[in-house]
């Protein structure tokens, strides 16, 4: 590697282009190692050719701040690097204000609570006191039944102090914990809560949670997310403006920094191998063509939410929505294999994943590289049981079109005889709702699960594949190959 007189800043891969660059280029001469790579700062590589002028505004560049890179084909490039500096370092060093616990103290003293309403559960975080998830049901006579779990409270002082002591030690050593929030590594202050409702899946040990407070100047202490990261252990992310006065907890935008790689005499403006890779990507990027049916205005029917968040219910996650992609089989072959049960849909984000094999079973599972696969049979298919169920329930739901015709918008199937439930001592059972979902990706499928009652589930499956077979449903909602 050859250096300019001003030295070399860190060369950081901030995206696919830079990852490709690192694979294509190698430093030449000098015998020194490249700077250490990190993902903290994103970069973008530009290939301006032999002649160009450095930007005079924005990030600062110097002509002598460069590296000479050589490809496997002996193509040479002079890559000029931006002078990336952190203007917050001095402010952090000089900060003498309150620590994060002291900044959050007004919130804890106010006895205030924050709420997040999901499709079934409501989450209540009373700051400095407890975390509760609950569901209210009104019965005949307006009697209200409350189904609730405490995910943690402040009675478990040992857990609380352990979390806070760890956070204080990290702050002193400048190791503030961070969490990936929408692609941005964001600093947070953790508050531990233990002594929650006993968890039957963990030998009745109490549930526990970590509340992660992150800075957001315009927030009002909202609950951003609730996730069950492992069985009966939760993470709750809270947005608060109170931490924003502390420089170490402020949200920092990461602007993309441009690197300019000039081609040296005898070299093309861009490496040959990189151009070949880009051409291959263009070939693979086949545009999706919408058919006439998909060009029609979308109906106003109720649509299941498509939120990528694992949400806990009872001792298990109950609303987990995720999008997966089916291999590019031909549509006819894919439908045939789906209806035969040989092609299964998989989905879910978080601890639990779901497998649905049409006419066979619904499984809930978790895979761990150390302990292997944990699987729960949620329901198995029996056509006679389903037909009996269909006599008392709606197996085929219609949508009325503007021209007065009816089309099938959803079918529901009953799968019973699952594994015995610890709470009810009865077999688990699930109602599978198959619904058409228009998408720019014709092979996408969304799978999610609800648990409105203990061990009685609803599995939602939405896909463009289902659009092609819904109208074949008979009076019992059973599907067949289209003509």
From Swiss-Prot:
This is Endoplasmic reticulum lectin 1. One of its GO terms (biological process) is ERAD pathway. Probable lectin that binds selectively to improperly folded lumenal proteins. May function in endoplasmic reticulum quality control and endoplasmic reticulum-associated degradation (ERAD) of both non-glycosylated proteins and glycoproteins. Glycans are attached at residue 195. Disulfide bonds join 113-126, 199-232, 215-244, 344-357, 421-455, 436-467. N-glycosylated. Keywords: Disulfide bond, Endoplasmic reticulum, Glycoprotein, Repeat, Signal. May form a complex with OS9, HSPA5, SYVN1, and SEL1L with which it interacts directly. Interacts (via PRKCSH 2 domain) with KREMEN2 (when glycosylated). Interacts with HSPA5. The lineage of its organism: Eukaryota, Metazoa, Chordata, Craniata, Vertebrata. It comes from Pongo abelii (Sumatran orangutan). GO terms for molecular function: unfolded protein binding. Residues 1-33 form the signal peptide. It holds the Pfam family PRKCSH. The gene is ERLEC1. InterPro entries: Man6P_isomerase_rcpt-bd_dom_sf (IPR009011), MRH_dom (IPR044865), OS-9-like (IPR045149), OS9-like_dom (IPR012913). Residues 111-246, 342-469 form the MRH domain. It is found in: Endoplasmic reticulum lumen. GO terms for cellular component: endoplasmic reticulum lumen. The keyword Glycosyltransferase does not apply.
């Amino acid at each position: 590697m050859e250096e300019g007189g001003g030295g070399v800043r860190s060369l950081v891969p901030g995206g696919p282009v830079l990852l490709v660059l690192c694979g294509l280029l190698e430093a030449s001469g000098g015998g020194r190692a490249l700077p250490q790579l990190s993902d903290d700062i994103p970069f973008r590589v530009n290939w301006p050719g032999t002649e160009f002028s450095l930007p005079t505004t924005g990030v600062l560049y110097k002509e002598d701040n460069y590296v000479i890179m050589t490809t496997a084909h002996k193509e040479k490039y002079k890559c000029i690097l931006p002078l990336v500096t952190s203007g917050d370092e001095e402010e952090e060093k000089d900060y003498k204000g309150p620590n994060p616990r002291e900044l959050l103290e007004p919130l804890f003293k106010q006895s205030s609570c924050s709420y997040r309403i999901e499709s079934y559960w409501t989450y209540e975080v009373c700051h400095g006191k407890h975390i509760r998830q609950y569901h209210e049901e009104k019965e005949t006579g307006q009697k209200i039944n409350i189904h609730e779990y405490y995910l943690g409270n402040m009675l478990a002082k040992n857990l609380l102090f352990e979390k806070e002591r760890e956070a204080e030690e990290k702050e002193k050593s400048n190791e503030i914990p961070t969490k990936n929030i929408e692609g941005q590594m964001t600093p947070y202050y953790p508050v531990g809560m233990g002594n929650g409702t006993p968890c039957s899946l963990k030998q009745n040990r109490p549930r526990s949670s970590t509340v992660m407070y992150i800075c957001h100047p315009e927030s009002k202490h909202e609950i951003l997310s609730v996730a069950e990261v492992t069985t009966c252990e939760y993470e709750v992310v809270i947005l608060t403006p109170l931490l924003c006065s502390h420089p170490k907890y402020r949200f920092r935008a990461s602007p993309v920094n441009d690197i300019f790689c000039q081609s040296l005499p005898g070299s093309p403006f861009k490496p040959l191998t990189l151009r070949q890779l880009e051409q291959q990507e263009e070939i693979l990027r086949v545009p999706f063509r919408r058919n006439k049916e998909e060009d029609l205005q979308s109906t106003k029917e109720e649509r299941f939410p498509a939120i990528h968040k694992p949400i806990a219910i009872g001792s298990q996650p109950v609303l987990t929505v995720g999008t997966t992609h089916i291999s590019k089989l031909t549509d006819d072959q894919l439908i045939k294999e789906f209806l035969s049960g040989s092609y299964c849909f998989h989905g879910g984000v978080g601890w639990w994943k779901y497998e649905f094999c049409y006419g066979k079973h619904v499984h809930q599972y978790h895979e761990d590289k150390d302990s292997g696969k944990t699987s729960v049979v949620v329901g198995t298919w029996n056509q006679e049981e389903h037909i009996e169920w269909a006599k008392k329930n709606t197996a085929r739901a219609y949508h009325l079109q503007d021209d007065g015709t009816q089309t099938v918008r959803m079918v529901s199937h009953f799968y019973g005889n699952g594994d015995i439930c610890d709470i009810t001592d009865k077999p688990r059972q699930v109602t599978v709702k198959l619904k058409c979902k228009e998408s720019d990706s014709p092979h996408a499928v969304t799978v999610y699960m609800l648990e409105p009652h203990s061990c009685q589930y609803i599995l939602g499956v939405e896909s463009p594949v289902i659009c092609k077979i819904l109208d074949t449903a008979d009076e019992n909602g059973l599907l067949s190959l289209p003509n």
